[in-house]
Amino acid sequence: MGQKVHPTGIRLGIVKEHTSVWYADGATYADYLLKDLQTREYLQDKLKSASVSRIDIHRPAQTARITIHTARPGIVIGKKGEDVEKLRQDLTKQMGVPVHINIEEIRKPELDAMLVAQSVAQQLERRVMFRRAMKRAVQNAMRIGAKGIKIQVSGRLGGAEIARTEWYREGRVPLHTLRADIDYNTYEAHTTYGVIGVKVWIFKGEVIGGRQEELKPQAPAPRKKAAK
């Protein structure tokens, strides 16, 4: 069977950026990596209801700058900034360096692969039919402006005895085109029948010369007049 490379990993340095940016060597590298993993796990657990898509970690000169990309910034910030200040104190203690937290709002959650996967998984946990959940998410993404989207669910769908995989796609999802801006992410739905995996690919357009290039249909070539 053909295997697929991770769509984000293959595009790093081309159209995608790393989510952890720092330099270290030897034992320091392992320590930084472990703390990054622990920080992400802590934040994802703490901010479950805040629709967090991505957490970027930068470490400039004995400090840490954490950027939280969320569709619901009000939940992260809290009343008068109390929640985000408590988060900052906890992370400073956990990471052992002064931490600065930035919050970036996601304006179009329908075009974010992680948030779409979370939404489909939550619907599956509420016993919504998987085909309906997939179709609704695909239609919303295409309406907002996606060039293409594919959603795949795997597991005991509808409580079936035998696990299977189903998928739904609209538009183009060119996995081999390295300049294609493809947002990919996964999430798990924990149902009474077991775990159902959700994968989402969203094609937003091609990045040419460092900017987003809108894909427009090519005009048909003019017809040649027949010689008399």
Swiss-Prot record:
Protein name as catalogued: Small ribosomal subunit protein uS3
Residues annotated as domain KH type-2: 39-107
The gene coding this protein: rpsC
Family annotation (SMART domains): KH
Lineage, top ranks: Bacteria, Pseudomonadati, Pseudomonadota, Gammaproteobacteria, Pseudomonadales
Keyword Electron transport: no
Species whose genome carries this gene: Pseudomonas entomophila (strain L48)
GO cellular component, one term: cytosolic small ribosomal subunit
SUPFAM superfamilies hit by this protein: Prokaryotic type KH domain (KH-domain type II), Ribosomal protein S3 C-terminal domain
GO molecular function term, any single one: structural constituent of ribosome
Annotated function: Binds the lower part of the 30S subunit head. Binds mRNA in the 70S ribosome, positioning it for translation.
Similarity field: Belongs to the universal ribosomal protein uS3 family.
InterPro entries in UniProt: KH_dom (IPR004087), KH_dom-like_a/b (IPR015946), KH_dom_type_2 (IPR004044), KH_sf_prok-type (IPR009019), Ribosomal_S3_C_sf (IPR036419), Ribosomal_uS3_bac-typ (IPR005704), Ribosomal_uS3_C (IPR001351), Ribosomal_uS3_CS (IPR018280)
Keywords annotated in UniProt: Ribonucleoprotein, Ribosomal protein, RNA-binding, rRNA-binding
Statement: the UniProt record of this protein carries the keyword Electron transport: no
Subunit structure: Part of the 30S ribosomal subunit. Forms a tight complex with proteins S10 and S14.
Biological processes, Gene Ontology terms: translation
